[in-house]
Amino acid sequence: MACLTLALDAMGGDFGPCVTVPASLQALASNPQLKLLLVGNPDTITPLLANADSLLLERLQVIPAEHVIASDAKPSQAIRASRGTSMRVALELVKNGEAAACVSAGNTGALMGLAKMMIKPLEGIARPALMTVIPNQRRSKTVVLDLGANVECDSTMLVQFAVMGSVMAEEVVGIVEPRVALLNIGEEENKGLDNIREAAAVLKNTPAINYIGYLEGNDLLTGKTDVMVCDGFVGNVTLKTMEGVIRMFLSLLKPSGEGSKQSWWLKLIGRWLQKRVAKRFGHLNPDQYNGACLLGLRGIVIKSHGAANQRAFAVAIEQAVQAVQRQVPERIAARLEAVLPKSD
């Protein structure tokens, strides 16, 4: 198999190289065909590679970038001042064909704007959407978009998201005739904002989409739908709320350190319950599905959580590898051409 090269914004995220560098080494160790371009400040990155395996370092290259886009910077200002930043240099590597995909945990708005400006949307797509695939209670997967790229969406954008999500569910996840739902405040047809109701009317009359109607937020993990569509504001809040609840739930399974006075048999039962529940629900751990694909571009861009740890960022790198191997942009473009009208 040919070498697969990815560009990583090593300086992005809450923890920067402290997370991205060890995660990169972890990804290289698990994928012998992978080559990584770490974009950022060499003075910060290089010391973190001092004890790395020399064989791994043969497939890793540090690309200098003097500046970093702050996580709290306004997207418009960040884009104007983006030259020489680690995020922009990483995207330029994709644009120039030196890397097959870009992974960044940096400023979401800046990443969205720069990616749209440099890599360009697919024909027929107004604005890209952040998409992830999450596990559900049926041990299957649910495609969810938008997760924050577009705070406000009109009905046309929601329809485009539905088409892209359906393509991802079918072509990448492997679901035949995936069910598509719009996230709403109720399942009744008269519920919701105008843009949601207008999108529903269009989707009902789109034969290529298996539209099943509205679903509420409490159905996100039930597996009632294969694709859940919403605007970026609702999607981001919903996903992060869900992840927070899951993290709290999983943390309750860990020993609290307060059970030293418990009898041995209570401790034994407690450990048994922890293992059983962890086995049943551990697949819902957000670290295992970190990495949202900026869907609708001519190239592949993966957005990691800003607060991602080493394990989670390594998962985002793997998401990029899979997106490249499965030729996500090409597959989406082929399906969009048959479903969506071409722009003038």
UniProtKB/Swiss-Prot annotation:
Pathway(s): Lipid metabolism; phospholipid metabolism
Pfam families the record matches: FA_synthesis
EC numbers for this chain: 2.3.1.274
GO terms, molecular function: phosphate:acyl-[acyl carrier protein] acyltransferase activity
Annotated catalysed reactions: a fatty acyl-[ACP] + phosphate = an acyl phosphate + holo-[ACP]
Keywords assigned by UniProt, alphabetized: Cytoplasm, Lipid biosynthesis, Lipid metabolism, Phospholipid biosynthesis, Phospholipid metabolism, Transferase
GO process annotations (BP): fatty acid biosynthetic process; phospholipid biosynthetic process
Record localization: Cytoplasm
Major subcellular location class: cytoplasm
Catalytic EC class: transferase
GO cellular component: cytoplasm
Top-level taxonomic group: Bacteria
Quaternary context: Homodimer. Probably interacts with PlsY.
Role according to the record: Catalyzes the reversible formation of acyl-phosphate (acyl-PO(4)) from acyl-[acyl-carrier-protein] (acyl-ACP). This enzyme utilizes acyl-ACP as fatty acyl donor, but not acyl-CoA.
Record HAMAP family: PlsX
Protein name: Phosphate acyltransferase
The organism of origin for this protein: Yersinia pestis
Gene this protein is translated from: plsX
